Amino acid sequence: MALRLRSGGIVNHELLKAVEQTPRTLFAPPQYQDEVYSKRLIPLECGSFMEGCDMAVRLLHCLNLKPGQRILEVGTGSGFTAAVMGRIAERVLTIDRYQTLVASAQKNLEKAGLRNVVVRQADGSAGVPGEGTFDRILITAAFNSLPRTFSDHLVSGGTLLVPIMMSETHCRIVRVNRTGSRFDREDLFDAPYLPIVPQVASFL
């Protein structure tokens, strides 16, 4: 896997080390254990999915993670990406609208030995009031346009990675870097994300 990631341009040693220290088998459903390191999407509960290994690591590589950072993730899923970020960063807050996924991810993170990752059920479309600012923000549900709420959560020098719906069927990963009051946008690559659903789920 490491050789495949390196050949795909992932050369950040600290990120690769964090990925190797975080077994994806702890985060995937039992019936998909043989495919955890493949490029395919792995179905989760509540209609969610776990990104293919290459896509997950590519997203984290685009964030340029560093020790000491505070990170926000919107869309917890299995908890895998939060776990990898937790190996590098000082603190990770990850939120999801589904309590089922929150509870499952919490168990997965405990099995992986992560103590600096906080998992919370919250409305991912509304930001995280009262949580202050973050060095990095990763969003894994698509918005129709750049979400100002999350841009305001960035420190100067911070980076936001968010899927943006370019059309009804076309989604692209966009990176936003903040410098003071200036926000610089960079369109990166297409990705298979679905539009974000507002409000927390009532029954799942």
Curated annotation (Swiss-Prot):
It catalyses: [protein]-L-isoaspartate + S-adenosyl-L-methionine = [protein]-L-isoaspartate alpha-methyl ester + S-adenosyl-L-homocysteine. Its main location: cytoplasm. Pfam families: PCMT. It is an enzyme of class 2 (transferase). Keywords: Cytoplasm, Methyltransferase, S-adenosyl-L-methionine, Transferase. It comes from the Bacteria. GO terms for biological process: methylation; protein modification process. Its EC number is 2.1.1.77. Monomer. Belongs to the methyltransferase superfamily. L-isoaspartyl/D-aspartyl protein methyltransferase family. This is Protein-L-isoaspartate O-methyltransferase. The gene is pcm.
